[in-house]
């Protein structure tokens, strides 16, 4: 949620030798083994060559995309190339493998320096954020230092991001903080998805082009659709009357939630890739039953998020 969103080796076994053995061991050439070994090596080399060639081709296409003018279609195309060649959809939740693949295209693994954390940050929330940043592009953590911003990790029942250093009730600035000094990410310190989700809002806040692209994506998917209250889609939920969405056929209606200067597109996508769990609730079927979905059920959306991870 966004708060304040106005902003093949061959082995030949040896028999055991006793200490006084005077036997000689001679080499025996196994021609079939050599043939098998050569074949394996050739295939391995071909695989490495082809993968390297694919990486170079994707990098070339990636460098041709200017994020300042890029469309959502550009990033979907980029994401599609990586997904088809490296099966991102088959690696959901495997954070180390995801990081390994994305490292082929940009520097991954962000860190937050001790002096970037705002004082009195909650240790449990801080730990979760530290882990999430370590799997994300390095540039995302660098947004803070590059803009001379502090990060406060706060504890609250419901996770949210705020573009300033504020208390959990968002009624005042934290002691010692002034407008523009930093940003806040809140969570309960237990829910694993929160950190991966809220960092997405932080990234959007530092990169207006991403918000533009995400809004273009929503618009392309919801032409002619009228907003719907989330509380109507999910009875007995805690959604407020003012929380409305363009639900489309997204894996979660929450993806189309309306903000003036923010979206849930990147945040929901990141959560769906890095910490997918059992998927998202897509719709309420009645009688206490729900339909769920994963990001692999919406390839266009998946490819968009991959593209943003690479270029955002």
Regions found by a protein language model. Give the residues of each.
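Activation/maturation switch segments at domain boundaries
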Residues: 1-111, 291-312
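Histidine-centered active-site/metal-ligand motif
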Residues: 18, 197, 201, 264
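A short, highly charged nucleic-acid-interacting micro-segment common to nuclease
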Residues: 111-132
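Hydrophobic (often cysteine-bearing) scaffold residues that line and stabilize catalytic clefts
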Residues: 121, 125, 192, 259, ...
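Active-site scaffold of zinc-dependent metalloenzymes
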Residues: 126-206
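A contiguous pocket-lining binding segment that forms or flanks enzyme active sites
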Residues: 193-233
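Metalloprotease/metallohydrolase-associated module, dominated by Zn2+-dependent proteases
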Residues: 218-312
